[in-house]
Amino acid sequence: MTKKVFIFSASTGAGHNLAARSLAEALQGRGYDAQVYDAFKESSAALNRIVTKGYKQLVEIAPKLYEQMYHQFNKMTPFQQNIFKVMSKVMNPEIVPLIEKEGPDLIISTHPFVTNMLGTLKAHGAFNQPVLSFVTDYKIHSVYLHPMIDAYVVGSEYTKQTMVERGVSPDIIYPFGIPIRTEFMDAPSEGSEKGDPAVRGTIMVM
């Protein structure tokens, strides 16, 4: 029987969605039924506008304020935790019935907000499937961290170490790298295709 995987992301910057699509493509190529969902778009139109458009406008118009908010949420005080509890309740009406109806074998998140909210929903008994978080940032942010997340895939040993320093068990952190599109996996450089000995390889700037 084909294993079913749900991959949740959010449209705050293209990177999280691109990672989700890259994962789905890789899993589908290995025989999994992998589906990508925008967690906010699938749940609440109002929340989706606030998170996606609000994020974009904040970064463009008030980058200093965004920086302050970034560092404030990195502390994850009870106040910040309560915000995510409220957000998880807004997300709940559509996401949880979808999980109950389709019964995925694994749930993956490529976005820190979604990771935290899925952990909160799982903590309240909304579902019991394992949740895997793909950390698409090299420097960990506290929003990614939730005790109900079963495993993390991170981009480097450095990221793993910063998570261990914050109390996450090293046994559930896997420094396998950040997902990329399959066409980049074995893409030869233009020079190497032409047999240019001066070209040693291809560098992808992220």
Task: Give residue ranges: language-model regions.
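Extreme N-terminal starter segment of soluble prokaryotic enzymes
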Residues: 2-6
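N-terminal glycine-rich, Lys/His-bearing helix-loop that initiates the first secondary-structure elements
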Residues: 9-12, 17, 26, 30
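Active-site and donor-binding regions of nucleotide-sugar-utilizing enzymes
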Residues: 14, 19, 72-168, 172-175
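Conserved N-terminal ligand/cofactor-binding loop architecture of enzyme catalytic domains
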Residues: 22-96
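Generic structural signal for helix capping and beta-alpha/helix-loop junctions
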Residues: 44, 116, 141, 180-183
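Short, well-ordered secondary-structure micro-motifs
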Residues: 47, 144-145, 185-188
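A nucleotide-sugar donor-handling region in carbohydrate enzymes
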Residues: 150-206
